[in-house]
């Protein structure tokens, strides 16, 4: 059977790590031929999707329309095959999902059931509810948060539950490909705390800066905070650092070698998120065996309850800045004393029962 993974986001957010991990899982399914439909360039091949995030507004709109048309034609011509669509709960997902649902064998891989910045919009939520209730038949679920949204949407189809796929790629870094700003962001004699990925309010960049502002001077002398990623809505400007020398801020696309460099050199990965349904940043931290310092939200609580040696969970209090500051301070004070990633937790993480169950259920569904 031909299996097509549909990823319109692609190069815009570094989705190739996830796609490659997913393909490795699908390779275990007998007689499966897998292709990723994305906007990544391959030598001698035209990309399936145009990069709808590059250029002026007219180019972006034209690319989006072209992508819709290209996908509907492809799905119609290959409707006997299987399509797996990666959704992030954005408004532009709605037509993409409707198109993919034209194939009887479709599976919606839900990264977010509705995007975090629009989950209070009743009109958009109703549109997703209509789609899940009337058109979508099969989904992949990574978290309880997604399950709750599906219940709210009256979704009655098949739910395949699985943790975020474990990354598997080379950890070697080609130093010439690493920008000087990234090389200079790490201070070897300091405790380097990394905030990585797309920067927005939901991911709590303001909570992190506020927390660092509240640390005492002794702790501040020990740390270097590296913020690396794209800031689409100027979220980083919401709170000003009390001491800008504690921060190295890189607001741009981070290439693969720079990602490896930052994760290899950092001491901790900060996750001060307000909400999330899953986190590739968390999985990347685990892949590099870097402990996380995480806010007290259900997804992180669930992960660190299962793998307690993988990081530190902040207390569950209303003042997120104070709470994260105390957790940061306690973690730095015990740096070099607390041990992380013990053998039992790591073995359980690598050989998760949920992953094996997912492979079995997915294979059975594919061959129905």
Regions found by a protein language model. Name each.
Residues 16-21, 200-214, 283:
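A conserved mid-protein helix/loop that constitutes part of the nucleotide-sugar donor-binding site
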Residues 66-67, 83-103, 277:
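An aromatic- and histidine-rich active-site surface loop
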Residues 72-73, 99, 121-139:
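Membrane-proximal helix-turn-helix segments that form the acceptor-binding/catalytic region
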Residues 134-159, 166-168:
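A short, active-site helix/loop in glycosyltransferases that binds the activated sugar's phosphate group
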Residues 183-203, 209-212:
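Conserved donor-binding/catalytic core segment of Leloir-type glycosyltransferases
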Residues 236-260:
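Nucleotide-activated donor-binding/catalytic signature segment of Leloir-type glycosyltransferases, i.e.
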Residues 261-277, 290:
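Acidic donor-binding loop of glycosyltransferase active sites
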